[in-house]
């Protein structure tokens, strides 16, 4: 998968992806590591709306991932429906060293389904895998929850960058694959180049066939 800078040619697709999960699980550092290869060990909770973009190439098509951070709103249980609007992918993040953040996953998943399409491609992310001596949630527990909910799964470390790019790429690739299958199966569009559908506009995938995004898949750290 190739990456591009913001100055390169306009993208074929724009996918909105949201980061959700309890405060201080490392969402902002995951985004910083993926988008800018940076890490802030003493970072405070995000304040204000923030999103970053990253371009990548999949099968010769240029994809721009527009990745949104909750901007600290989760501390006040005030993540709004506008945050989720138009999202086609999500990273649902917990901290492997804080079991309570794992227990909150069900609430975040319900909120995601309430405010967005049920078919949003979602990966469950156990962050801070570098904190091995402080681990409170086992890899097996994370995998089991992901399998039960039909989610992808991966453990990451924003500190040492383990699996960070892979987690985002998993979501983007699955969104693209699903969109490509929909284009190929459409009688009206089967002779067109899939890139002609979006050409730089946000992609919102129709919600027919609710199980289509639920391609349970697991990757451990």
UniProtKB/Swiss-Prot annotation:
One example GO MF annotation: GTPase activity
Lipid moiety-binding region (S-geranylgeranyl cysteine): 218-219
GO biological process: protein transport
Record protein name field: Ras-related protein RABA5a
Function recorded in the entry: Intracellular vesicle trafficking and protein transport.
Annotated Pfam families: Ras
Family statement drawn from the similarity comment of this UniProt entry: Belongs to the small GTPase superfamily. Rab family.
Subcellular location: Cell membrane
Primary location: membrane
Domain of life of the organism encoding this protein: Eukaryota
Organism: Arabidopsis thaliana (Mouse-ear cress)
Keyword field: Cell membrane, GTP-binding, Lipoprotein, Membrane, Nucleotide-binding, Prenylation, Protein transport, Transport
Location of the motif Effector region: 43-51
Any single GO CC term annotated in Swiss-Prot or TrEMBL for this entry: plant-type vacuole
Membrane topology: Lipid-anchor
Residues annotated to bind GTP: 21-28, 69-73, 127-130, 157-158
Cystine residue pairs: none
